[in-house]
C-alpha cells in the first residue's frame, strides 16, 4: 500500500499502523514496507524517509552507458544502490527477528512458481535479501541469488496483490474467524 494511504489511515484511526495489524504482507515495494513495519515497528515517518526522492535516485541509478545505449543488454539498474538503502534500514537482521509476522512474495525461477518468504517459516533469511528478491523486477533489476541457491524475482510476477495470501496466512496463524484484510 502506498505510504500516503497508510499515513491517512493512521491519522484517521489515531492508532499506529504497527498496532493496527497482526500480520504484514507485501509484494515488490510493498514487501519492503511490510518488512519495515513488521520488523522494526517503524512509524510512517520512517517509511517516508525510506521512499525519498534521494533514495529512489540511488535505487534506480544507471551508468552513463546504460542511459545512452540504444539496446538494453542487462538489467536497467544494478542492485548496489537498492541494497545500500535496504542495509541502512535493516542492517543484518533476519526476518525471523520481526516483531510481528511478516510475509513477502517472490517468484522462484527454477521451480517456476510463486513462493512466500515469511518470518515464521524462513526465520534465517536476511531482511535485505527478502526485500531485494521480492522487488527484483525483470528488466529493471538483476535476479536475486539467495543463500540457499535459489534464484528469485519480483513477487509481482505472479502475486501482484497479495491480499488473499495474507488472508490465508492469517487463518493459519491466528485462531479466530474475525480476520479483516486491508
Predicted regions and their residues:
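Patatin-like phospholipase
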Residues: 1-182
